[in-house]
């Protein structure tokens, strides 16, 4: 269910704005998206795991807040990110 260190490093490298960037909204949203996708797969075989479902909802809301922030600050980066991650339209 967790993101492995190698996978997280790859996600950071793909979405970083500069070398060593780990805290930009783009990187945070990409890591959250990976965790959300992992939990979604988990629920396909564990449908009644309501404790983890709460965690999933918290991750989705955190990602939503970060995306709202990014959209408010820089709409071009927002549209590029949702296109790259395959979110929304």
UniProtKB/Swiss-Prot annotation:
InterPro entries: Ribosomal_uS15 (IPR000589), Ribosomal_uS15_bac-type (IPR005290), uS15_NS1_RNA-bd_sf (IPR009068)
Gene3D superfamilies with a match to the protein in the record: 6.10.250.3130, S15/NS1, RNA-binding (1.10.287.10)
Organism per entry: Rhizorhabdus wittichii (strain DSM 6014 / CCUG 31198 / JCM 15750 / NBRC 105917 / EY 4224 / RW1) (Sphingomonas wittichii)
Gene name, Swiss-Prot/TrEMBL: rpsO
Similarity comment: Belongs to the universal ribosomal protein uS15 family.
Subunit (UniProt): Part of the 30S ribosomal subunit. Forms a bridge to the 50S subunit in the 70S ribosome, contacting the 23S rRNA.
CDD domains found in the cross-reference section: Ribosomal_S15p_S13e (cd00353)
Stated role: One of the primary rRNA binding proteins, it binds directly to 16S rRNA where it helps nucleate assembly of the platform of the 30S subunit by binding and bridging several RNA helices of the 16S rRNA. Forms an intersubunit bridge (bridge B4) with the 23S rRNA of the 50S subunit in the ribosome.
Record keywords, A-Z: Ribonucleoprotein, Ribosomal protein, RNA-binding, rRNA-binding
The keyword Ribonucleoprotein is annotated on this UniProt entry: yes
GO biological process: translation
Protein name: Small ribosomal subunit protein uS15
Coiled coil segments of this chain: none
GO molecular function: rRNA binding; structural constituent of ribosome
Keyword check for rRNA-binding: yes
Record's GO cellular component terms: cytosolic small ribosomal subunit
């Amino acid at each position: 269910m967790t993101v492995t260190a190698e996978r997280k490093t790859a996600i950071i490298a793909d979405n970083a704005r500069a070398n060593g960037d780990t805290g930009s909204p783009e990187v945070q949203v990409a890591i959250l998206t990976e965790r959300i996708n992992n939990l979604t797969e988990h629920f396909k075989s564990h449908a009644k795991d309501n404790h983890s479902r709460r965690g999933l909802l918290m991750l989705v809301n955190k990602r939503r807040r970060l995306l709202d922030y990014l959209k408010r600050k820089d709409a071009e980066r927002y549209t590029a990110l949702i296109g790259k991650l395959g979110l929304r339209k």
